[in-house]
């Protein structure tokens, strides 16, 4: 037997089968930074339209987790895709560097500021710690393949940024949005500080739920108002009961609130009268285990306004007041009101000029002058409050109650609502809420439900407490009058003076400032504010401190992209401060992604053992697998990740890599400038392949523009596996391997492969950037050193509508091929044939389909990958033929059988002319021509 292997054009490439990503990616990464790829890309796009994605700063504490990886990869995909669109896309990463978590880490090592270490040294240690965390996170983000200005990130602790945060505060003060007040705020006793809304998490908690009698001091007045005819005056006891799950707040009670428009009834039982909301009588009396009662009077809540009640255990009268916040969701329809311990209570208390009493210290302990409970922690005092109520005869009912309660995000402990002197951004004083609601409507929200979510949050939120009683942060650099508490009338000028000093020396410039340096003789009248700003203010004003400041950026940014929890966090703090500065949103578009969960939908946690660390994935599978998983996930919902899911992603990656390798291997010996065939001269099947890529590129680009990356993954994967792997690449192997090296048949095919590869490498580049770079290096022809410097490939072209071998033609051929393959599979299962080339097929077709298939002539067999394929009229179909159904009358009948002809050892086709040539007795006539003659001519496939 002769060996004809040397006569075949076998595939050959240096592109390895295995990605070995964990080893190769760091090497490629080093190359990117040695050649300043990001800088070159910026220079390449200079002067082009700009697209600005503003990076929401992660917190500079701890290793990056899978959520960080998702966020940064999504941003990087968008930036690289927009760059492919031809935009100038600067990416300036940032970090949030102030705040409590860093303070707590430093406290563990150095002790508390002002105790074991000076405040200055403490802040220095915080700065040093934050810088070390930034360095660690930066390397991991770079390792993910995220391209950006990593040498010049923005840090909220940079001196200039700290100064600009102050300037932004000054602008917001100037517009009248900042107020000072003694108001209830979320307070963590463990932190010793107020908390922002975004720092509050809701967890299940069991609390004592109690119904408490507030005795009516003037029963005759109740008789008169409710028309009771003396029932109240005659009763032994008359009360309005409240229901609460926070007994510890009762010492601060100042009133009982009713809804003005609700109907209330007076219920009589035994020798007692109770006033209850009509809708809640049944549930309340069931709670009190009273079956035998009667309704003796009715009135609206408004009628009872001003009725005097007795505090259940303090020597204090409290009034009945009216509030729209009272509901009938539960309880009694009467709400215990402590303005020092709740936002609704505070608001209604202001209307009635009630005292805002707060008997609780910052550590959660009752103040020394608190009757009955002095020195006790509020939560530990709950049982004692209940006992005292029972002792005084004020307790109607008591039971444990499981409910959702706010907890500190850091300590995971229940928080307090506690009135303290704080600085606030007022939502309504100067129209901020109104302007914010208007600005929201001008933003493009992805997904669309994001708009309704942030609208409801902004519409319902209280004023924003921006002050914190901590050490590590940007100071609220105000001087306030010692007597009135009012800010200095020249605060705007003074803030700028402080900002200039902070720009030189950091926040210590304020903390160590002698007021006389700026105020002169006025220093005696004023004192420095020692509070610092909420870190959400720091990150919220990056539209002013970063976007406005850096020449390559702009405000509004085109896109903010973060997790869906940021509707109540960064998206909102950015919106409010931007409205406070310039009355517009800081972003044109907002994109949110869901959280990561495991395969079963469970939240990631160390205790469950289901945490997927991005560092481990990169060190084993490679960053491109992580990037492909992100792209393949529908990030608008929760994103499931596990070792099993990543393994399946790696399998999909291998299929795409193998497709790329096949393309590259079959471009061996092809130089586009020399060998590329003009579109009109290409074989119809090759033009079809380019057309498929052309159509796909349109869809891919549209999906990138709509941020639908999972669709890109599905489409490109499907193209590789079905269009290419399942059809085109299978069909062209014969032509590619067996025809003459420089024949039109082969060069046409290589031209198609080249066009497809040029498109594919760019579609993949934003997603699996490392692999795309590797493909790029192995493509033939002159090219830049990085695919990331490129724009979308413009060499793809569509099929002409008038082409007899147009899209409709190939759709029908593919349908025929699918029907033939099903029958061949049956023959294979029946052990009649092995490979499809062992088969011969006869197709009996209706006239229209026959006319189409006849266009391919003898080359139909190459499309079907059978040794023979004949097309005949449907009427001639033998009874043993099989019906193959089709759409629109395109069904046909098929007869398939094993070929009886000998096999050509070179092309493996079974042909009647094998052995007809004395010099090549093992070859078919076609192969003889390709080896020794002029070579075969292909017209179609």
Curated annotation (Swiss-Prot):
Superkingdom assignment: Bacteria
Binding-site positions, ATP: 606
Motif ('KMSKS' region): 603-607
Entry-linked Pfam families: Anticodon_1, tRNA-synt_1, zf-FPG_IleRS
Cofactor(s), by name: Zn(2+)
Record-listed L-isoleucyl-5'-AMP binding positions: 562
Subunit record text: Monomer.
Domain comment (free text): IleRS has two distinct active sites: one for aminoacylation and one for editing. The misactivated valine is translocated from the active site to the editing site, which sterically excludes the correctly activated isoleucine. The single editing site contains two valyl binding pockets, one specific for each substrate (Val-AMP or Val-tRNA(Ile)).
Sequence similarity: Belongs to the class-I aminoacyl-tRNA synthetase family. IleS type 1 subfamily.
Protein name in the entry: Isoleucine--tRNA ligase
Protein source organism: Alkalilimnicola ehrlichii (strain ATCC BAA-1101 / DSM 17681 / MLHE-1)
UniProt gene name: ileS
């Amino acid at each position: 037997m002769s060996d004809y292997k040397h006569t075949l054009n076998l595939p050959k490439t240096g592109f390895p089968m295995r990605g070995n990503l964990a080893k190769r990616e760091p090497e490629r990464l080093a190359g990117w930074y040695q050649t300043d790829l990001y800088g070159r890309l910026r220079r390449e796009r200079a002067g082009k339209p700009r697209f600005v994605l503003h990076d929401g700063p992660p917190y500079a504490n701890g290793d990056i987790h899978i959520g960080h990886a998702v966020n940064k990869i999504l941003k990087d995909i968008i930036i690289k895709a927009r760059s492919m669109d031809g935009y100038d896309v600067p990416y300036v990463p940032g970090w949030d560097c102030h705040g409590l978590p860093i303070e707590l880490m430093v406290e563990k090592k150095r002790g508390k500021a002002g105790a074991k270490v000076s405040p200055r040294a403490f802040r220095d240690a915080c700065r040093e710690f934050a810088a070390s965390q930034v360095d660690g996170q930066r390397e991991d983000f770079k390792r993910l393949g995220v391209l950006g200005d990593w040498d010049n990130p923005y840090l909220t602790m940079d001196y200039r940024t700290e100064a600009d945060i102050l300037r932004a505060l000054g602008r917001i003060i100037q517009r009248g949005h900042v107020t000072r007040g003694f108001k209830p705020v979320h307070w963590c006793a463990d932190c010793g500080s107020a908390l922002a809304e975004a720092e509050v998490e809701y967890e299940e908690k069991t609390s004592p739920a109690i119904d408490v009698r507030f005795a009516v001091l003037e029963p005759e007045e109740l008789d008169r108002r409710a028309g009771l005819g003396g029932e109240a005056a005659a009763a032994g006891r008359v009360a309005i009961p409240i229901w609460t799950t926070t007994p510890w707040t009762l010492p601060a009670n100042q009133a009982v609130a009713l809804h003005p428009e609700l109907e209330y009834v007076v219920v009589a039982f035994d020798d007692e009268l109770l006033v209850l909301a009509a809708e809640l009588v049944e549930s309340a009396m069931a709670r009190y285990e009273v079956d035998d009662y009667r309704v003796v009077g009715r009135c609206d809540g408004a009628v009872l306004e001003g009725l005097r009640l007795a505090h259940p255990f303090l020597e204090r009268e409290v009034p009945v007041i009216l509030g729209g916040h009272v509901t009938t969701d539960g309880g009694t329809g009467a709400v215990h009101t402590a303005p020092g311990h709740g936002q609704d209570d505070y608001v209604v208390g202001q209307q009635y000029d009630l005292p805002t009493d707060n008997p609780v210290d910052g550590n959660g302990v009752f103040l020394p002058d608190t009757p009955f409970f002095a020195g006790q922690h509020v939560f530990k005092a709950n049982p004692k409050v209940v006992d005292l109520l029972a002792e005084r005869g004020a307790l109607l009912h008591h039971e444990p109650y499981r409910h959702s309660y706010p907890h500190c995000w850091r300590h995971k402990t229940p928080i307090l609502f506690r009135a303290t002197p704080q600085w606030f951004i007022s939502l309504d004083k100067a129209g901020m809420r109104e302007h914010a609601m208007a600005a929201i409507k001008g933003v493009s929200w992805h997904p669309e439900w994001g708009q309704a979510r942030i609208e409801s949050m902004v519409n319902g939120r209280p004023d924003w407490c921006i002050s914190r009683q901590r050490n590590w942060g940007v100071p609220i650099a105000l001087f306030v009058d010692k007597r009135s508490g009012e800010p200095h009338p020249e605060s705007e000028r003074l803030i700028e003076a402080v900002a200039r000093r902070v720009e030189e020396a950091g926040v210590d410039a304020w903390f160590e400032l002698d007021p006389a340096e700026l105020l002169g003789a006025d220093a005696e009248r004023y004192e420095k504010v020692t509070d610092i700003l909420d870190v959400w203010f720091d990150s919220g004003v990056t539209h002013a401190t970063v976007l406005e400041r850096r020449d390559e950026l702009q405000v509004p940014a085109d896109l903010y992209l973060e997790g869906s929890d940021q509707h109540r966090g960064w998206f909102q703090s950015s919106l409010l401060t931007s409205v406070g500065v310039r009355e517009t949103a800081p972003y044109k578009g907002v994109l949110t992604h869901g959280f990561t969960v495991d395969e079963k939908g469970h939240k990631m946690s160390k205790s469950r053992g289901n945490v997927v660390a991005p560092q481990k994935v990169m060190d084993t599978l490679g960053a491109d697998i992580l990037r492909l998983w992100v792209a393949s996930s529908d990030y608008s919902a929760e994103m499931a990740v596990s070792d099993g899911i990543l393994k399946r992603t790696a399998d999909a990656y291998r299929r795409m890599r193998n497709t790329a390798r096949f393309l590259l291997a079959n471009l061996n010996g092809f130089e586009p400038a020399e060998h590329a065939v003009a579109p009109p001269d290409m074989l119809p099947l090759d033009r079809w392949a380019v057309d498929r890529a052309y159509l796909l590129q349109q869809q891919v680009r549209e999906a990138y523009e709509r941020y639908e990356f999972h669709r890109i993954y599905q489409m490109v994967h499907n193209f590789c596996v079905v269009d290419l792997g399942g059809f085109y690449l299978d069909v062209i192997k014969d032509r590619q391997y067996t025809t003459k090296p420089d024949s039109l048949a082969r060069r046409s095919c290589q031209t198609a492969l080249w066009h497809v590869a040029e498109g594919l490498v760019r579609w993949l580049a934003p997603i699996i950037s490392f692999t795309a770079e590797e493909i790029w290096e192995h493509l033939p022809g002159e090219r830049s050193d990085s695919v990331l410097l490129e724009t979308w490939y413009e060499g793809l072209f569509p099929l002409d509508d008038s082409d007899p071998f147009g899209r409709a033609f190939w759709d029908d051929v593919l349908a025929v091929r699918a029907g033939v393959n099903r029958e061949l599979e049956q023959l294979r299962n029946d052990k009649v044939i092995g490979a499809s080339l062992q088969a011969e097929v006869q197709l009996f077709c209706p006239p229209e389909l026959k006319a189409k298939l006849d266009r391919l002539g003898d080359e139909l067999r190459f499309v079907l990958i059978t040794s023979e394929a004949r097309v005949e009229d449907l009427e001639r179909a033998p009874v043993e033929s099989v019906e193959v159904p089709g759409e629109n009358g395109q069904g046909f009948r098929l007869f398939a059988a094993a070929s009886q002809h000998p096999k050509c050892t070179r092309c493996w086709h079974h042909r009647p002319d094998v052995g007809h040539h004395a010099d090549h007795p093992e070859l078919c006539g076609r192969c003889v021509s390709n080896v020794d003659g002029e070579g075969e001519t292909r017209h179609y496939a």
